[in-house]
Amino acid sequence: MFKKVDKKASRTKRHLRVRKKVFGTPDRPRLSVFRSEKNIYVQIIDDVNAVTIVAASSLDKEFSTNNGGNKEGAKLVGAAVAKKAIEKGITEVVFDRGGYVYHGRVQELAEGAREAGLKF
């Protein structure tokens, strides 16, 4: 018989494995992505001080409600977090894809942040 693969557990294992290598500092904080079915969330985190510096999501008031779970919405969220980060003086980050495959919404979010001026 075939075993059913638990995708959430696989993602969590992948995320923990990557988190051993990816670490955010005050000079180069970590850009962390969380993707739900309907929305996408992103934070810029300083792991040394355990502080979230900047956060944005598709639930923010500046985004339309019908654009949360698609690639266009993810690109807008990436641009928004980059704009907020640049206002705080952050230009370089380490990208933490959260165990997700670098494809689709995660890729669009990264491209939106890059186009808005963040360096990975």
Curated annotation (Swiss-Prot):
Gene name of this polypeptide: rplR
GO biological process: translation
Subunit structure of this chain's protein: Part of the 50S ribosomal subunit; part of the 5S rRNA/L5/L18/L25 subcomplex. Contacts the 5S and 23S rRNAs.
Database matches in InterPro entries: Ribosomal_uL18_bac-type, Ribosomal_uL18_bac/euk
Keyword Ribosomal protein: yes
Keywords of this entry: Ribonucleoprotein, Ribosomal protein, RNA-binding, rRNA-binding
Function: This is one of the proteins that bind and probably mediate the attachment of the 5S RNA into the large ribosomal subunit, where it forms part of the central protuberance.
SUPFAM superfamilies for this protein: Translational machinery components
Gene3D superfamilies named among the record's database cross-references: 3.30.420.100
UniProt family annotation: Belongs to the universal ribosomal protein uL18 family.
Name assigned to this protein: Large ribosomal subunit protein uL18
GO cellular component, one term: cytosolic large ribosomal subunit
A GO molecular-function descriptor: 5S rRNA binding
